[in-house]
Swiss-Prot record:
Pfam families: Snf7. Belongs to the SNF7 family. The lineage of its organism: Eukaryota, Metazoa, Chordata, Craniata, Vertebrata. One of its GO terms (biological process) is viral budding from plasma membrane. GO terms for cellular component: amphisome membrane; cytoplasmic side of plasma membrane; ESCRT III complex; kinetochore; kinetochore microtubule; lysosomal membrane; midbody; multivesicular body. PANTHER family: CHARGED MULTIVESICULAR BODY PROTEIN, CHARGED MULTIVESICULAR BODY PROTEIN 4B-LIKE PROTEIN CHMP4BP1-RELATED. InterPro entries: Snf7_fam. Residues 1-17 have a biased composition (Basic and acidic residues). Residues 1-24, 132-171 are annotated as: Disordered. This is Putative charged multivesicular body protein 4B-like protein CHMP4BP1.
């Protein structure tokens, strides 16, 4: 509505601008000034309305954001209501204890057990050294002649020969 009035006033200003009669021109100029004043007021009103519209949109956006943040806070609080930091610490300690116990059990199960045979560590080391020394001694005693390696089969027919290339002689 204000936009239509604005257009109407602009047309009136243009119409009154071109009059040649001095008293009529003076009257037209007065009307033009009034119309320009009304036009400025309408422009200011439209600007204020646009500003208010943007402010209202921003307020609605802020309201929605706050509602969502409140809902998120309530949901988080509900999720944490059943949790207590002491209970969480206790639970984490129980998990760590059970993990440690499981590792101890695995280590105990994987240890070799002699089932009544107790061997002295020094005796085992001495026996291992003897076995390690026997292997090189055996290799030294078993020196044999050269090994025979079977040769590949050779064709029994004559292969075609290539013609000899002639060499260029330079003089």
């Amino acid at each position: 509505m204000l936009s239509k009035k604005q257009e109407f006033l602009e047309k009136k200003i243009e119409q009154r601008h071109g009059t040649k009669n001095k008293p009529a021109a003076l009257q037209a100029l007065k009307r033009k000034k009034r119309y320009e004043k009304q036009l400025a007021q309408i422009d200011g009103t439209l600007s204020t309305i646009e500003f208010q519209q943007q402010a209202l949109e921003n307020a609605n956006t802020n309201t929605e954001v706050l509602k969502n943040m409140g809902s998120a806070a309530k949901a988080k609080k509900a999720a944490h209501d059943n949790m207590d930091i002491d209970k969480v610490d206790e639970l984490m300690q129980d998990i760590a204890d059970q993990q440690e116990l499981g590792e101890e059990i695995s280590t105990a199960i994987s240890k070799p057990v002699g089932f009544g045979e107790k061997s002295d560590e020094d005796e085992l080391m001495a026996e291992l050294e003897e076995l390690e020394q026997e292997e090189p001694d055996k290799n030294l005693l078993e020196v044999s002649g050269p090994e025979t390696v079977p040769l590949p089969n050779v064709p029994s027919i004559a292969l075609p020969s290539k013609p000899a290339k002639k060499r260029k002689t330079t003089t």
